[in-house]
Structures are given as C-alpha cells and as structure tokens.
C-alpha cells in the first residue's frame, strides 16, 4: 500500500515538472517579447524623422510651438469636422502623434462658416476668437513648380483660380511676357489666401504645381521663386 502511494506521488511529480517547465518557458518567452517590443518601439520613436514643416493645421491653430503645447490630443476637432478632412497623426505621419492635421492634396478644408472644429477645441489650441473663416490662416498657396504649370507652358489653365473659395481675391491670373508670348500666370495674394488647399487639390497635374504650405515657409518659398532660387522646402 505504502509502495503504491509512493509510486503514484512519484508519477504525479514526474508529470507536473514538465508542465511547470513549459509554463515557465512560455512566461519567459512572453516577457522577452514584451521587453524586445518595448525596446524596438522606443528605438523606432527615437529614429522617427523630425516633424515636417509642411504640416497643415485646422483653422485657428496657434503658432506651431504654442499649438503643440496647448493641444491635448483629444480629437474633438476631428470628430466635429463634418467632412472628415481632419485626422489625428499616427507615428507614421509627418506631425507629432495625436495632433490634428489635414493633407490638402487629399482633401482641402471646406471652410465651414460656423467653423465647428474651432468651437470643439477645449483648450484654445484652435483660437476661439476666429469667427470669420475668411480670416483663417492655415497656410498660403505657392506656385512651387513653374516648369510644370501649364500656364508657364503657354497653355490656358485657370482651374486653381476658378475653384478658389475666395474667388477673384486670393488667387488670380496676371499677365507676364516671356519668349513664349504673353502668359497668364496664377498669382496668390498672401493677405487673402486662407491656406484651405482647394487649389492644390484640384490642380490637374499628377503632382500639383501649386501647393499650400504653412505661412512662414510658404512666403519663404514664394520669395525664393521670385528671386530664381531653389525653393527651400524641397
């Protein structure tokens, strides 16, 4: 009797030990994966390039440094955008993670008269004093590529002028004489342009010749183009 019980205990112990070893091995593997994942994730975030200077923010956004400090990444402005233009940046986007931005070439700001994104912001990162969408300053449109713009080739394209929400004020065609003759060149009035991106969205070229850039950068590019220098954003 005693011998049988001893054999049973020995048999049970023999079965339990491999199970415990398997559980320990699985636990060790999971911990290892978690540690490696954490290290890899941290390294990935550290290796991310600095946020691009070409990111476009919602209407009423404060200056970029102040905006990043005030924005709590709540996503309320994104939720309240009726056209789903705004999105929150992921780690792969050219903006700090969780901050709202839009890509004009994909979808421009529709310039809602009631500016719901501004009203939704709880912190003032989108300035509540902005009540007239025509006073928004999301950026400025710049003709960044004279070589591909159809008007510089002597053709008559006026798409960017015709689709502009502030038609006849923010962008117009100005006559310029060159070896090809009298050209009608898209010209942006930076004091009237809101940076909505409608012109960039509707440019008929595969890569838009006109782009919307944050105002400081855009004015620098415009000045470089006028002086015949290489645009600073390229």
Curated annotation (Swiss-Prot):
Protein name: Methylamine utilization ferredoxin-type protein MauM
UniProt keyword terms in alphabetical order: 4Fe-4S, Electron transport, Iron, Iron-sulfur, Metal-binding, Repeat, Transport
Keyword Lipid metabolism among record annotations: no
InterPro entries associated with the record: 4Fe4S_Fe-S-bd, 4Fe4S_Fe_S_CS, MauM_NapG
Pathway where this protein functions: One-carbon metabolism; methylamine degradation
UniProt signal peptide: none
Keyword Repeat: yes
Chain residues that bind [4Fe-4S] cluster 2: 109, 112, 117, 121
Function summary: Involved in electron transfer.
Entry GO MF terms: 4 iron, 4 sulfur cluster binding; metal ion binding
Pfam families the record matches: Fer4_7
Listed CDD domains: DMSOR_beta_like (cd16373)
Domain 4Fe-4S ferredoxin-type: 61-91, 98-131, 140-176, 184-215
Residues given in the record as [4Fe-4S] cluster 4 binding sites: 193, 196, 199, 203
């Amino acid at each position: 009797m005693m011998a049988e019980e001893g054999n049973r205990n020995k048999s049970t112990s023999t079965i339990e030990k491999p199970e415990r070893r398997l559980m320990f091995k699985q636990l060790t593997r999971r911990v290892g994966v978690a540690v490696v994942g954490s290290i890899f994730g941290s390294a990935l975030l550290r290796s991310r390039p600095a946020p691009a200077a070409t990111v476009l923010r919602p209407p009423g956004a404060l200056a970029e440094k102040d905006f990043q400090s005030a924005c709590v990444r709540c996503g309320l402005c994104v939720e309240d955008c009726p056209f789903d233009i705004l999105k929150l940046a992921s780690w792969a986007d050219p903006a700090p993670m969780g901050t709202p931005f839009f890509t004009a070439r994909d979808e421009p700001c529709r310039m809602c008269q009631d500016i719901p994104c501004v009203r939704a912001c709880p912190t003032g990162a989108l300035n509540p004093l902005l009540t007239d969408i025509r006073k928004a300053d999301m950026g400025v449109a710049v003709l960044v590529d004279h070589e591909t713009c159809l008007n510089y080739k002597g053709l008559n394209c006026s798409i960017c002028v015709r689709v502009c929400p502030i038609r006849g004020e923010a962008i117009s065609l100005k006559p310029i004489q060159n070896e090809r003759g009298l050209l009608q060149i898209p010209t942006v009035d930076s004091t009237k342009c809101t940076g909505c991106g409608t012109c960039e969205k509707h440019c008929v070229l595969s890569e838009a010749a006109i782009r919307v850039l944050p105002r400081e950068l855009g004015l620098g590019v415009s000045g470089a183009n006028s002086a015949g220098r290489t645009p600073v954003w390229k």
